């Protein structure tokens, strides 16, 4: 047509966000099967707090924070700083790319699956 069509969101960004959203959902489903686990997704975007990890959980009395990335994804500087502050306060904080990463993190902290 005579008017160019420009996507509002670049396709690569949409695909990445979809994958990360699917990973977050899969991780939450996994966590909700664990005894003594309370987990929730934090809300990013315009109304969320920048740098806060995607998933927060209390597992058997231990605080966990998981920043979910697609495989090959990288943390922003603010996310790195936030995970470091959580660790400094005694919490467990991880960047994860799969349900298996979450299981490994919980095991590394001495938790049971």
Predicted features and spans:
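Catalytic phosphate/metal-binding cores of nucleic-acid and nucleotide-processing enzymes, i.e., regions
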Residues: 2-113
